[in-house]
Amino acid sequence: MIEKLNFHLRFKTNFGQTIYITGNHPLLGNGNIEKAVPMVYLNEDYWVLHLATKGLLKAETICYSYFIQNQDGTRIFDWGSDKSIIVDQLATKELVLIDAWNFTGYIDNAFYTAPFANVLLQSKGLQVKAAHPKNATHIFRVKAPILTTNQSICIIGEAKEIGGWDATKALPLNKIINQPYFEIALNLSKCDFPLVYKFGIYDTELKKFVAFESGNNRVLYEPVSKNKLVVVQDGFAQVGHNQWKGAGVAIPVFSLRSKQSIGVGEFSDIKLLADWSKKIGLKLIQLLPINDTTATHSWMDSYPYAAISAFALHPMYIRLSELVDSNQSHLIQDALDQQIALNNLTVVDYE
């Protein structure tokens, strides 16, 4: 049963800024931003929060995040939803969570969006059998969205328990299913602290160390003590930023003409574009704005960036034949009679 819960956030704030923590538990404001709990400034690198939790944590999953409040009341939010505590999986009296701030603008975050996570990078991140001792004192978690086939993440450092900087003794991390991070649990009870370490790339097929991450060594100051578990959520491994490359096509919808179009590309033509892109190996499709631009009812409305609404889509991209059934086809017959002539034009007859 967790009796003490300690949050440590690595972040350098400016004068007048305060960091808050919010989460789906009464101790963290129960999801209400206005009831978020302020953290305490420790030093130029850390903000902390210590909570007494004896008897207050059930077998539940607590999701939490951080935000910065400036002197003028504006807020900057930590990006993502991967910070969580699965209470019944952590058998300890004291839990220390050492987190890294996730800036929205980090390029790595783009690779966790739906197109990459569900399609383009779906097969990446192979499972590795990582060590997980029952008497673990520390758990390390790190994210690495851009890895090639047969690559995983490993940890290596100064202490002999993490390889003693011997690349042949690097320890592979396991990719956690349905989570964005890799993880390894270690017993560091015989290590000297501060602990100096780095993450690296590990070849899961050859079972060997490939390369160190870029940047400075990482340093962990939280030592071992009885009945305490330290979970280090280390942000992103500094690897692979330039490993993913994908060709794509940028095109306005109005230029997509198929045999079913009536002189202008339509939303339904995007399916054909997607099929063609897949066939020739393209990875991305960028469309020019598709918002309604009808303002003057003249050719001047053809400029796709002159939107009159941020929400309304342009009606000219609708496929008329998909709006009517066989009993209503006469309603669009006039347009269908001009279909071939309009499709043969070199430019869109906007008026």
What are these regions (language model features)?
Residues 12-58, 69-90, 146-193, 202-224, ...:
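Aromatic-rich carbohydrate-binding modules that target alpha-glucans
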Residues 60-64, 193-197:
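Exposed beta-strand face motif in extracellular beta-rich ectodomains
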